[in-house]
Structure formats: C-alpha cells, structure tokens
Amino acid sequence: MASTVITLLIVTSLTMWTLSTTTARSRGDGRRSGGRGGERPNIVFFLADDLGFNDIGYHNPAMKTPNLDRLAAKGIKLENYYVQPVCSPTRSQLISGRYQIHTGLQHSIIWVAQPSCHPVTDPTIAQKLAEAGYATHAVGKWHLGFYRKACWPTRRGFDSFFGMLTGSANFYTHRHMGGQWNLPGSGNWSGYDLRNDLEQVGQDYQGVYSTHLFTQKSQAIIREHDQSKPLFLYHAFQTVHFPLQVPAHYYAEFGHIADEKRRVYAGMVKCMDEAVGNITATLKESGMWNNTLLIFSTDNGGNLKYGGNNWPLRGGKRSLWEGGIRAVGFVSSPLLPKSARGTVHKNLFHVTDWFPTLVKGVAKGSLRGTNIDGYDVWKLLKRSGRNTGSADWPRKEIVHNIDPYSALSSALPQRFFTTFPAAIRYDNWKLLTSQSENGSWVAPPESSEKTVHLRESPQKRVWLFNLADDPNEKHDLSLERWDVSTALLRRLGRYLRQSVPVYFPPPDRRANPALHNDSWSDWIK
C-alpha cells in the first residue's frame, strides 16, 4: 500500500508540474554556492573518449587504472552521473550547459563534411570562466564543428588550442580518413587533423602517439602558467576511441585477455591513466595541486564493437540504454572538505550541471546571458558524506534526448510520437521510446559472465523501468505501470514543444581536405 501511495505521488507531480521557459532559464541561479572569499581554484577537466562504465579499475579490477582509482578514492565518485550516447552532444552540453534539444544537435554527431557546429550564439564555459579571470586552454579532441573559424576553440573562449578538430584520427599519423556515409566518393578523403591554435601541425609530429603528445602539451601549459590568475585546462583525450592503437608495452600485461580488441583497449586505458598521473604530478611539481579541482568524465558509454564494455548495464555507445549514457565520473581535490573525500555520491547528476557548477559555484563567475538546463550543485556536492539527502538536491529529471529528425523535413513536429527515439528520467523512473541500438547485456571478455541477447518485437515502441529496483533495465514495466508511462510521455511532448528544430545539414564537398592543403579545415569564410 505504501509503495502505491508513493508512486501515486510521483505520477501526480509529473502530471501537475508545468514546464516554463522562465524556470528552465533560471536553473543555474536557483541553487547558489555559498560564501565569498578564498582563492579561486584551478580547474582541470579530463574528458575520456568512449570509456565504458566497466572500463575503470574501481568498477572492474581487470582494468589497470591506479592513478584514476587513487584520485577517485580521495574524492567524490559520481555513481548516478549521466552524459549523452555519442561524442558531439556530450561535448556540446558540457561547454554550454544546455540540452541538445535546445541546440539542434538531437540527431547525431557533427560529421566532418557537415556545415555545422555548436551554436556560436551560445556562451561557452570557457568564455564565462575567462570573464571570471581564468586563463583557458583546450588540449585534445574538439568535435564540435569546424566548417567556419568562428566554430573553433580559440574563437569560443579558449586562449589556446592544441589538438584535433574531427572525431577520430590515426593516433600516430594524425590523419583522419573518410568523409561522410551519405556523400558518394568521400570515403577515401584523407587529411591531417592536428592544430596548434589555427595552424596545421600534423606533419610535424609524425609517429608521436597522440595521448603522449597531448599529455606533454598539458604539462607545458601548467609549467608555463602565470599563477597570478587561475587556470582552466580542458584536456579531452582521443583515447579510447577507435582506431585501437597503443604502444605494445601498454597491453603486454593483458595477455590473459584472449579477445584482441579488448586486450589493446585495456592497454589504451592504462596509457590514459598514466597520462592523468603525469599531468597530476606536474600540477604538484608546479605548486598548483593544493588549489586545483580535478574532474574526470567520459563522453558516452563504451563502444561494444571496439573493445569497450559497460557491464552490467544494458547497451552501449549510440544507445539511450544505461550502458550508453551512465558515465564514469568523479571529482578530486585537496580543496574538498575532509568529510567529502572518499565518498560515493548517488544523487542525479548530468553533464549540463558542470557549466553552472564550475562557472558560478567554483569560479564565482556570472551566468548572465546564458540559457541553461544545468544546476549549480557545488555547495551541495561539497556536503557529500554529510547526509546530503535527495530532497535538497535540485535535479530530479533528465531529458536524455528527443530526436524527431526526418530527412524529408526540418520542421519541428507539433506533437510527440513514440516513433521518435527518446528517453526521459524522472526520479527513479526512466522511459524510452523507439530504441534501435543494441539492447543486450554484453559481458566483458576477461570474465566468466555470459552475454545476454534480448530479441524484442520490432513493433515495440515504449519501455519503462524503475532504476532504483532495476538499474540494469531487465524488467519492462511500461504496460504494468501505464499510468507512469503516460505521464512521462506527456512530459516528452511538453519538452518537444520547447525544442528547436534538428539541425543536421547535408554534407558539403567543399570539406574535402584535398582542397585545403591536405588538411581538415574550415571551408566557409
């Protein structure tokens, strides 16, 4: 009876809670981080690429990540933390604090030949931190569009950029090959993709493994930093994205893993862990560590085709199942209260929350001029371990995505249909519609666990799960709890009406690197 009453209250609140643009726009200011004074900390944000939920040592001892494990053990592990299922949308939400339904990036990644990028009208986290007095530097993978120079990192608030503009490249040659699947003849396009600010430098670093190269660059930034102002360093790893490449000595100790892809992948993870350790050591050597906040996150679930693993979660990269969006993440810093160190945080946290949390809560900057979907949770996060209840936590809901894209029309539909791929989380309830991606539970090759494949009717359109009782999405309650399903479908409809149209333009042949001195570059001035 008690369970029925609780559920009824949840459904009632879902039905009665009306959404308003004003509320959405004011969220960042809704929870203020208390207190002024104190030195503004340096912020180092590590973003791993395609790292699965089961691909870090503290989730899976088969993965060797001693540096990450040590940092997480001394910090706050975020165990109810969500990102997006593919690269560009997560990066977009990180730098803007906005859902992809509000930026037009609902459908996919930004492909190399698309005249598209994160909206240049949106203030970025780098711009707001620069306003707050920070030096801002980006190293590694951008993947937020580059067809115009206005889309590039140094035009979006970063003082410097060293890295790649596209979504993938050879780790040694720094060349990206392939145009776009729907552009005939572009499959053999190839060009350098390594930039030092605006200059192409790929040919200067032939044979240098990119994880090592990016690490050295971040170390140099730290050593050369003017410590009279705080530092924001955004280090976006290329690893562990395909192609699966790493110096052999990194995977030599994983000979017991029979699956070759998984074995090399484990070596790539080990190399990334070493990089985090080296950069952290440089912060300490430079006398900056005691005033640094370090954040580690992945951008989406592990790619099941290329060695990644999300066990025991369902699905993987590209899907809205938990394996595609529930992320590895933690915060570590000597600045954390002792009571917060070594804690596990289980309140709902989304990648959009980093923007207001870091800009307003940590840097004491302003959110004026932003239109964000994230929450400033810095004050509450620091209370981790001191009985921080979910009642105090501002985030109760995540709109994972609504993708109404149709190749026939760019117009925004006037109503929600269950044929749209979508997912929404409210409290412990999660509803999904029209999921075509892998919904299996794929066991790690190094374990004795068994993969479970689920075959469902292609006509099935709605799933509902209570993640408190069923975190691995095994028991669909969509029919049994049709009251909850209906309430969440209505909410998706309301969010759809607040969305912007999907922006997914056709590819452009002017992107061909052969037209740009053998490099991927802007092609519209």
Regions found by a protein language model. Name each.
Residues A2-W463, P471-P506, P513-K525:
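Formylglycine-dependent sulfatase
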